[in-house]
């Protein structure tokens, strides 16, 4: 009996310790679940139409947009990120990943000639992004869309509807200025002049924020001025 009376408190203490460890394990497991649930999947949707070559912001709109995206990457920790580029059509150039170094390399390589068809088709952009979100739970789907908003196909309402159906929140960023600038025309990287209209007048491209604001506010996101 004497041995038992000595061992019993030790067993009791061990049992108590195991209980505490089990509780800690359970709680930290819950904490981990909470953290995992907070992970967002963010798709950068970047306008690569020719007007993004305009130099009304330094050095030019597309480069400013790329710099903004790289700044976004620096604020991210566990979020997954993918990249879609669009003009008159849209294409995915990077699948969702948490490899931010790879993402930066992809962003650096984007130029306006990656999409041939001109225009600014927000619906196609959202559709391609939605396709990438298929395996992602609806509360974690976010788009960061950067565009000058110009020459859009007038289908932002359809794009908003698609985003809402898919549970996607759009945060949009407008680049360019209200005064605008001419659109440089490059051939094999050489500046050949500026885009002209049928009457030979130089076309001035201006930032159009209305559609960008609707895309953000109507999907529960925010609109930001790329110049700030």
Describe each region flagged by the PLM.
Residues 1-21:
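Juxtamembrane linker/hinge segments adjacent to transmembrane helices in membrane proteins
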Residues 19, 103, 129, 170, ...:
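Residue-level signature of catalytic and energy-coupling elements of molecular machines
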Residues 25-141, 155-158:
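Membrane-embedded segments
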Residues 40, 78, 166-169, 219-221:
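Short glycine-/polar-rich loops that comprise or flank the Walker A/P-loop
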Residues 43, 84, 144, 171-173, ...:
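Hydrophobic/aromatic beta-strand patches that form the interior of the parallel beta-sheet core
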Residues 48, 148-149:
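Active-site metal-binding loops of divalent metal-dependent hydrolases
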Residues 116-120, 142, 149-214, 218:
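VWA/integrin I-like adhesion module and closely mimicked acidic/polar interface patches used
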Residues 218, 222-228:
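Juxtamembrane amphipathic/hinge helix adjacent to a transmembrane helix
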């Amino acid at each position: 009996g004497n041995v038992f009376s000595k061992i019993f408190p030790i067993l009791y203490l061990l049992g108590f310790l195991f209980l505490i460890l089990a509780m800690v394990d359970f709680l930290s497991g819950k904490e981990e679940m909470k953290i995992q649930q907070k992970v967002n999947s963010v798709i950068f949707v970047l306008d690569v139409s020719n007007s993004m070559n305009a130099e009304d912001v330094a050095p030019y709109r597309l480069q400013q947009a790329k710099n903004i995206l790289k700044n976004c990457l620096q604020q991210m920790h566990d979020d997954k990120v993918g990249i879609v580029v669009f003009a008159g059509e849209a294409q995915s150039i990077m699948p969702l990943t948490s490899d931010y170094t790879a993402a930066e390399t992809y962003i650096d390589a984007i130029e306006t000639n990656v999409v041939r068809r001109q225009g600014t088709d927000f619906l196609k952009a959202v559709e391609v992004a939605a396709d990438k979100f298929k395996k992602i739970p609806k509360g974690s789907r976010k788009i960061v869309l950067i565009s000058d908003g110009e020459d859009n196909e007038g289908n932002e309402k359809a794009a908003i509807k698609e985003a809402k159906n898919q549970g996607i929140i759009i945060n949009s960023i407008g680049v360019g200025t209200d005064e605008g600038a001419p659109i440089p025309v490059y051939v094999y990287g050489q500046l050949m002049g500026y885009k002209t209209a049928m009457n030979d007048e130089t076309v001035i491209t201006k930032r159009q924020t209305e559609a960008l604001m609707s895309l953000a506010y109507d999907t529960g996101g925010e609109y930001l001025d790329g110049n700030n």
